[in-house]
A protein has these predicted regions:
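Acidic/His-rich active-site region of diverse nucleotide-sugar glycosyltransferases
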Residues: 1-64, 78, 87, 98-117, ...
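A short, glycine-/small-residue-rich helix N-cap motif at loop->alpha-helix starts
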Residues: 73-74
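Residue-level detector of anion-binding/catalytic polar loops
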Residues: 90
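Catalytic core of nucleotide-sugar-dependent glycosyltransferases
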Residues: 96, 109-134
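C-terminal accessory regions of radical SAM enzymes
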Residues: 120, 127-154
Length: 155
């Protein structure tokens, strides 16, 4: 998923969601990386992906009762991904699906502390602490090799 505003069109907004070991909250990974950065061009499973570009079979969506309207603004996408995983399915990021997204374009750019606290509290109360994505921590201090010097296979 690429940023939709002019000047940002060649930078990644989202290539999966991780649970950061520092605050136990979901975060986009690889934000602001270059479009063809090798680490953003690997299909892989995650705990969650963004709702800004999410595909799910209708039958599964209905079976897990879709998005939860108890969330005010944030984390509905993470919640639905957790429900998908709890139902025994994988949550997969693929670099082969490309979209441009103007984050906050309809709801506004900022989220109040009250909204964030409500939605984060709901997510944590409902799902508890999720396992860290062991190889995908935001500070990159663990696991993933630095692949920036590796050329992508663009056949």
């Amino acid at each position: 998923l690429f940023r939709g505003k002019e000047g940002y069109c060649n930078t990644v907004q989202h290539a999966g969601v991780i649970i950061d070991h520092k605050d136990d909250m979901p975060h986009h990974i690889f934000g602001n990386f270059a479009e063809h950065d090798p680490v953003t061009n690997i299909a892989r499973d995650y705990l969650a992906v963004t709702g800004a570009s999410l595909m799910i079979k209708k039958d599964l969506f209905n079976a897990i009762k879709g998005f939860d309207t108890d969330y005010w603004v944030e984390f509905q996408d993470v919640d639905i991904c957790f429900k998908v995983k709890a139902a025994g399915y994988r949550v997969r990021y693929t670099p082969y699906s490309v979209a441009y997204h103007d984050e906050g374009g309809t709801r506004g750019r900022t989220v109040s502390a009250e909204i964030r606290e409500h939605d984060a509290g709901l997510l944590l109360n409902r799902w508890g602490k999720q396992a860290d994505d062991m190889y995908l921590w935001r500070d990159r201090a663990y696991g993933l090799p630095d692949l920036r010097g590796v050329k992508a296979d663009v056949r």
